[in-house]
Amino acid sequence: MNKQAEPILLGVIGGSGFYDLPGFDIVESVNPITPWGYPASPISIARTTSGFLIAFLARHGVGHIYTPTEVPSRANIAALKSLGVLAIVSFSAVGSLREDIPPEDFVLPTQIIDRTLCARPNTFFESGCVAHVSFGDPFDQDLYEILSSCGSNLKNGSKLHTKRKGDDLTVVCMEGPAFSTRAESNLYRSWGASIINMSVIPEAKLAREAEIAYQMVCMATDYDCWRMNEEPVTVETVMEHISNNKDNAKIFLLEAVKKLEAPLLQGFLGRNLRESVQNGIQTNHKHRNPDAIRRLQFLFPNLTIPH
């Protein structure tokens, strides 16, 4: 497949329990090497009945071999960018911090609190080439609006939670791999957070740096550990709900792809991000590290190396 002749505009990242792309015709598997290594899994290329192409990768690798800290997020995002991806729909299991978000409900978050403690590489811009991206609204607004219209046909009574007027849905990203203490869980609730996971950072930051529209679709599996009358969350608790969540993720994604195809083909999604980062590099051109620029050229081929 020639990526320039046939770009793949939509990327999908699967989280815990979501390791393949059911319901789609897989036509190819690719494993592009990036300056930041290989992605967590080979990327499956699927084609819809209309001919629209989708790229799918498993965040934690085939067989779930990477902890949240170990996920090669830079390679994941860079590999999708190299295929032509303009928008990413990312799925993740989350714990609920609110009574009205029960297990197996879906959430489209609007804000992020980063509690990853700087343990993960979270930028493409380093070692002699500095850029600062705008991250006040960490998810793409246009992509959010389209995905907000999906999910009305989820099974088992599950529903999609989206932003109400003046009410952000905030996801806390913790380091892991251990779950929260009860004190931490209640602290996050006091901050007004809605859900908690271990994956949205640095994924969302890197997508923004790569000028890719990004939205995470969160699938609740538990109430974390803030409910004092319940046992704290365990892997067994999470796995009980992951199977149903995967079935609903397929339903959600099938609907989302249909609604995203036209906006992507028409150049609507991500239009505000194009060249926003590469034109905002702060390092003076003549002082840019050539090795750093060579890495960044994988994302932005038009960047030039200083002479």
Swiss-Prot record:
The keyword Transferase applies. GO terms for biological process: L-methionine salvage from methylthioadenosine; purine ribonucleoside salvage. Keywords: Cytoplasm, Glycosyltransferase, Nucleus, Purine salvage, Transferase. Its main location: cytoplasm. The record marks S180, V235 as: Important for substrate specificity. Its EC number is 2.4.2.28. Pathway: Amino-acid biosynthesis; L-methionine biosynthesis via salvage pathway; S-methyl-5-thio-alpha-D-ribose 1-phosphate from S-methyl-5'-thioadenosine (phosphorylase route): step 1/1. Substrate binds at M198, D222, Y223, D224. One of its GO terms (cellular component) is nucleus. One of its GO terms (molecular function) is S-methyl-5-thioadenosine phosphorylase activity. Belongs to the PNP/MTAP phosphorylase family. MTAP subfamily. Catalyzes the reversible phosphorylation of S-methyl-5'-thioadenosine (MTA) to adenine and 5-methylthioribose-1-phosphate. Involved in the breakdown of MTA, a major by-product of polyamine biosynthesis. Responsible for the first step in the methionine salvage pathway after MTA has been generated from S-adenosylmethionine. Has broad substrate specificity with 6-aminopurine nucleosides as preferred substrates. This is S-methyl-5'-thioadenosine phosphorylase. It comes from Schizosaccharomyces pombe (strain 972 / ATCC 24843).
